[in-house]
């Protein structure tokens, strides 16, 4: 049986001044380990919390399984959020993307929000060199706090990806 090693990275965007970047790693890939890493950050999720993930392509088994992330999502009282992809595949169109979300079991355990299902918003980029704004799903404005869960992956579009 082919073993697939997933590297989980829990990212939390916190604005700090003159702070050293800390990286938290675990050898244990489990629901409890995810909660321990999150708690080590020392930052409590407040308000309307979303948990950004990649729900994976329909035929691809490499994504963060709902049962792996369930304890953390429940602990922060989060809503799973995802966006459609810019490349052709099972998540490029809204209906197909919802089919993948269902097939992979996310909607059976969590509230799920496809952030760019209906609209998008532009967020200005400060001190821009190449981009004046970033386009994100319009539903992002509905949340106060985001926890981002990533798994390491390579993309045929030209590089490594995240959530």
Where are the language model's segments positioned?
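Compositionally biased, low-complexity intrinsically disordered regions
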Residues: 10-12
